Amino acid sequence: MSQMLHIEIPNFGNTVLGCLNEQRLLGLYCDVSIVVKGQAFKAHRAVLAASSLYFRDLFSGNSKSAFELPGTVPPACFQQILSFCYTGKLTMAASEQLVVMYTAGFLQIQHIVERGTDLMFKVSSPHCDSQTAMIEDASSEPQSPCNQLQPATAAYATSPSVPIPLLTRVKHEAMEMPPATGPGLASKRPLDTGPRDGVAVATGAAGTPGTAPLKLPRVSYYGVPSLATLIPSIQQVPYPQGERTSPGASSLPTTDSSTSYHNEDEDDDEAYDTMVEEQYGQMYIKATGNYAVQEKPEPVPLESRSCVLIRRDLVALPASLISQIGYRCHPKLYSEGDPGEKLELVAGSGVYITRGQLMNCHLCAGVKHKVLLRRLLATFFDRNTLANSCGTGIRSSTSDPSRKPLDSRVLNAVKLYCQNFAPSFKESEMNVIAADMCTNARRVRKRWLPKIKSMLPEGVEMYRSVMGASAASLPLDPEFPSAASQVFEQRIYAERRNDAATIVALRTDAVNVDLSTSANPAFEANEEVDGAGSVIQEVAAPEQLPADGQSSPQAFEQGNTSSSRPQTPVATATRRPEGTYAGTL
């Protein structure tokens, strides 16, 4: 048998995509042109179709080499989104977030819509008053402001061959102040009471205002720094606000077709993770070096603070979206308000949702009422709740009777809100969509069952091998809770004798073992009284069994007359060292 040679190039896909981006910038080998307000953008048809469901439907069955977008799409905004399709990086000003997010939703670019919109409201948290605030994974190490501004970052941002990071990062880029003039930073500071024009004033240690006002920092996705941060002498030039208009309704479909992006299978895996209940958390600067943050610092006067105060922007629906859907949304969305404000979805229903979450649903849905229903359901119900539910309670004869319907109070409020948004939306269609989401959630969870089985403790596999073929033939419950509960449950049905001693027989292929009440008093206390089939559960716990339960295996071993008998699960589970699997009978 000949040997097989395996060659693997790390980050090969990112390198190829970077080369395609270079070709696009040079105008080489491009097979399609996107015309926006008379300005043509050359690109590769395959890259656009892979990044945008809108372009995939547009290119389907159409061999034209030029396509024109609605005249209300701003060219500068489309240029940024086109660059994102090749690099996975998006940089925009804080005041342009809503327009960019809505344009990305119109083009059906899910990565921007689902990740960018969730981070949009985190950027301007009311307690985010540090010079640099980062949203990273929990395993990342604290970084000092000096380390974040290394020259290598500029090369990383400009080189197309650098692999795209897997985690989304958001940075606030602001002008660095001298370390000698910075006092200890307070953990909480009041909001800036200055004019709401997007300008924050930096003050020195002595209380003298800065020579020039600083613009609000630009938002950088995937850790791309702004040029003004790397080179402080260069000032940022804001984009013309007149061009930042949202796309019109000339190309928006008014009905959900079979190719709608929320009817695709690939959307089902992430539709339930886009909403986070507490997504407006506090972000503080990570103090390093000589700047230690006190637990209860003394209040510092506003005049002596040497950092930039970033206010929390108030949000409202864009005027371009209102012109398409009218005034069918929640009445509070048409006026500016705090994104963390709790709104009652329907008056008198008692079902509440934050302003930011509800606006996120409308920005993603646009004029599509079915997409709005899916987004609202994904906001109120997580994936596990949907997977363990039968939908609206209308179940078929083959459904598992243990599945309970979704909360009727929340479900009725969502239905009523969607009917107010689209009066022609039938309740039967809503029930089908809710049931379909539950089915998709179960299908996604079943994909992870082999991985969960591979992570089971060794005690479970040992126990099944000792119990023999009868116990091994019992499959794991496909609906058992996953890693969130940390409880692994295997049901074994035992027989119960009718005598007063209540002896449980554990039958295996090799031998029958009888545990009497005198030999195992702890087991008698835990034994269920009702029913003919008792259930024995295995619980994964780091601690050992209590002292009174450890005496039972010793008594059992003393009563053993044959050395050829296999060791019972009770004795094996008890002898395991601390920190491993412990079976509880």
Curated annotation (Swiss-Prot):
GO BP: any one term: protein homooligomerization
Localization per Swiss-Prot or TrEMBL: Nucleus
Domain BEN: 348-445
UniProt xrefs under Gene3D superfamilies: BEN domain, Potassium Channel Kv1.1, Chain A
GO cellular component: chromatin; nucleus
Boundaries of every BTB domain copy: 30-94
Annotated crosslink Glycyl lysine isopeptide (Lys-Gly) (interchain with G-Cter in SUMO2) location: K171, K215, K296, K426, K453
InterPro entries linked to this entry: BEN_domain, BTB/POZ_dom, SKP1/BTB/POZ_sf, ZnFinger_BTB_dom_contain
Any Pfam family the entry gives: BEN
Keywords associated with the record: Isopeptide bond, Nucleus, Ubl conjugation
One function term, GO molecular function aspect: histone deacetylase binding
Annotated stretches, region: Disordered: 238-269, 541-585
Biased composition (Polar residues): 238-261, 549-571
Protein function: Functions as a transcriptional repressor through its association with the NuRD complex. Recruits the NuRD complex to the promoter of MDM2, leading to the repression of MDM2 transcription and subsequent stability of p53/TP53.
Record's subunit section: Homooligomer; mediated by the BTB domain. Interacts with the NuRD complex. Interacts (via C-terminal part) with HDAC2. Interacts (via BTB domain) with MTA1, MTA2 and MTA3.
Record-given protein name: Nucleus accumbens-associated protein 2
Species, as recorded: Rattus norvegicus
